[in-house]
């Protein structure tokens, strides 16, 4: 036996490493059907198992990051379809498969049907965003299409009761698994549309295997959802479960509870928002009222300086002065006339002309009459002018307003009360009428709606 001149010599570890790279790079991803045996789950959370058929077997490993996405419980003896890459466990030189996904064997056929229907409906535009309907911001009534005995219904009702206990709910019970479930779901959606009593629908169920959820991948359900006039939220299984119904629905919720969150208002949050807005409104109103109060006080000060009563008092005083001056003038004139009469009488008495005296007496009487008439007319005119001035002033006088049945109410400090917010229970207030004042105690204060 002869050796080549330059043979390539491997160590065992080097050989295993190159074989591993060769398997991983050349073979790539493979799909494999087989029966589970020797399944073990150590504390690390990884799965170690053997896949076999009637003639051969292969060791497999499925690490924790991948096996947490498996939605069924693997068991020895169960037929499965796995997606894996070939590798080699170098320390022992064991050829093995690193499994990336696993599903029951029948799920492979179902997955193929799923992909074909998905492509067909997508080509028709049933998944397009332009075909989606907007969800109402504040639904008036929510319809739930699911099993009447399933956990999904309990979860949805629990969330709706917590967030918006007054929201009306209509339940359209239906099968959500097994033969005939797809037809019942489509009929329930059609019934909800024909009754037109809800403005949003939740269609869904809890988690399960691909076979359990298959009714939501049926074409009849997809087309019924697409044709619905009422917006539909799909809520099928868990977040990792994706169905044809999710693509066709107007909105997809990862879980039934999440769907209930989507379609309901958070009443407590809204109440907090209303309370915040109320506080802001009250603060703004207080600032506005404070500003108006300052403006009112300034106006009141200006009005008091120009009050009609003050003007009336000034005019009345002026009229009194004019009247006094008039009376003095008349008195002086009378005195002068009286003096003249006395002087003429003296002269007449000295001259003793009877006829002249008689004539002068008549003339004097005439002058006296005319003077008195003039005085009466002048006095009447002055009184008339005084009455007109008083009448004009009376039209703007607060006393005239009081005479018409109005009143003015002051607090204990003498400030005018214009609002029920300016008084407290037990305050003493004074109300002025045209003929006097009334003092009273506040026992009730209410605002007009």
Swiss-Prot record:
It comes from the Bacteria. One of its GO terms (cellular component) is exodeoxyribonuclease VII complex. The keyword Nuclease applies. It is found in: Cytoplasm. Pfam families: Exonuc_VII_L, tRNA_anti_2. Keywords: Cytoplasm, Exonuclease, Hydrolase, Nuclease. The keyword Electron transport does not apply. Its EC number is 3.1.11.6. GO terms for molecular function: exodeoxyribonuclease VII activity; nucleic acid binding. It is an enzyme of class 3 (hydrolase). GO terms for biological process: DNA catabolic process. It catalyses: Exonucleolytic cleavage in either 5'- to 3'- or 3'- to 5'-direction to yield nucleoside 5'-phosphates. Coiled coil: none annotated. NCBIfam families: xseA. Belongs to the XseA family. Heterooligomer composed of large and small subunits. Bidirectionally degrades single-stranded DNA into large acid-insoluble oligonucleotides, which are then degraded further into small acid-soluble oligonucleotides. This is Exodeoxyribonuclease 7 large subunit. It comes from Aliivibrio fischeri (strain ATCC 700601 / ES114) (Vibrio fischeri).
């Amino acid at each position: 036996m002869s050796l080549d001149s330059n043979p390539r010599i491997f160590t065992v570890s080097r050989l295993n490493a190159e074989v591993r790279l060769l398997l991983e790079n050349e073979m790539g991803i493979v799909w494999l059907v087989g029966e589970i045996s020797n399944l073990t789950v150590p504390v690390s959370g990884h799965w170690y198992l053997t896949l076999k058929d009637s003639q051969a077997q292969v060791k497999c490993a499925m690490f924790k990051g991948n096996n947490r996405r498996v939605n069924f419980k693997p068991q020895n003896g169960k037929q499965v379809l796995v997606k894996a890459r070939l590798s080699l466990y170098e320390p022992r030189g064991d050829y093995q498969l690193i499994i990336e996904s696993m599903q029951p064997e029948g799920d492979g056929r179902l997955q193929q049907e799923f992909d074909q229907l998905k492509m067909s409906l997508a080509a028709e535009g049933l998944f397009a965003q332009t075909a989606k309907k907007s969800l109402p911001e504040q639904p008036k009534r929510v319809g739930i299409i699911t099993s009447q005995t399933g956990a999904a219904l309990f979860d949805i009702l629990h969330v709706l009761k917590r967030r918006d206990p007054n929201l009306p709910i209509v339940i359209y019970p239906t099968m959500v698994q097994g033969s005939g479930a797809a037809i019942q779901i489509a009929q329930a959606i059609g019934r909800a549309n024909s009754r037109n009593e809800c403005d949003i629908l939740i269609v869904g169920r809890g988690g399960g295997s691909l076979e359990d959820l298959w009714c939501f991948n049926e074409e009849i359900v997809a087309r019924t959802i697409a044709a619905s006039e009422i917006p539909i939220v799909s809520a099928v299984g868990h977040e990792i479960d994706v169905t044809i119904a999710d693509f066709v629905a107007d909105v997809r919720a990862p879980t039934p509870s999440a769907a209930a969150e989507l379609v309901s208002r958070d009443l407590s949050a809204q109440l907090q928002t209303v309370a915040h807005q109320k506080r802001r409104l009250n603060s703004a109103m207080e600032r506005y009222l404070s500003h108006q109060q300052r403006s009112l006080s300034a106006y009141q000060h200006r009005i008091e300086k120009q009050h009609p009563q003050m003007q009336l008092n000034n005019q009345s005083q002026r009229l009194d002065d004019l009247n006094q001056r008039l009376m003095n003038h008349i008195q002086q004139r009378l005195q002068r006339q009286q003096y003249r009469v006395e002087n003429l009488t003296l002269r007449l008495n000295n001259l003793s002309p009877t006829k002249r005296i008689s004539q002068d007496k008549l003339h004097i009487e005439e002058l006296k009459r005319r003077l008195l008439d003039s005085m009466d007319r002048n006095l009447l005119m002055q009184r008339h002018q005084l009455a007109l001035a008083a009448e004009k002033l009376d039209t703007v006088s607060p006393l005239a307003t009081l005479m018409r049945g109005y009143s003015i109410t002051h607090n204990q400090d003498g400030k005018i009360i214009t609002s029920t917010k300016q008084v407290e229970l037990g305050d003493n207030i004074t109300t002025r009428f045209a003929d006097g004042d009334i003092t009273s105690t506040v026992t009730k204060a209410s605002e007009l709606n």
